[in-house]
Regions:
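Structural/interface elements that position substrates and couple domains in central-metabolism enzymes
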Residues: 1-164
Length: 164
């Protein structure tokens, strides 16, 4: 939205364009990593934790998680999401194309991959007990909120996040 506004106003949004390019490359990296670990994504259950663009909001406008879900659906993945506040807004976008879970445990159940997209405090507390409900324990942490050495999973931290 800001990029479009800047372009309309005759301003070259160089920094915003760079951020957008990084976001697109991060999405490609997530898809590539998931395919490398799971193979063809068709019929694979992939759980997205967090669809809001930041914690403590239900706002999904310009959320990179929404773009990721679109890419996963194009590859025929079975997508389940959990978000403490943004489920309704996500449902407005995807309707019945994806599954919605009110509990983290249900979202993780029988999942083959979990991708953490929003830094909700609930997600920072996740550990082996929660991940044991998965059929394949592949975790892609796009916010770097989990400490790898405490987890008995295939764990990949990418993108920006908290310093560990």
């Amino acid at each position: 939205a800001l990029i479009n506004f800047a372009n309309i106003s005759g301003i070259n949004p160089t920094l915003l364009n760079a951020v957008e390019e990084i976001n697109i490359k991060q999405l490609e990296q997530i898809i590539s990593m998931t395919k490398q670990k799971l193979g063809d994504l068709a019929s694979k259950k992939i759980t997205i934790l967090g669809t809001a663009f930041k914690p403590d909001t239900d706002d999904v406008r310009d959320s990179i998680a929404i773009k990721l879900i679109e890419k996963l659906l194009k590859r025929k993945a079975v997508v389940t999401i959990h978000d403490p506040k943004a489920i309704d807004n996500t449902r407005d976008i995807f309707g019945s194309k994806i599954k919605y879970s009110k509990s983290i445990k249900d979202a993780l159940s029988k999942s083959q991959c979990v991708i953490i997209m929003t830094q909700w405090k609930q997600y920072k507390k996740l550990g082996n007990n929660e991940f044991n409900h998965m059929t394949k324990k592949l975790i892609i942490d796009c916010r770097r909120i989990l400490i790898e050495k405490q987890l008995d999973v295939d764990y990949f931290a990418i993108g920006l996040g908290e310093e560990k």
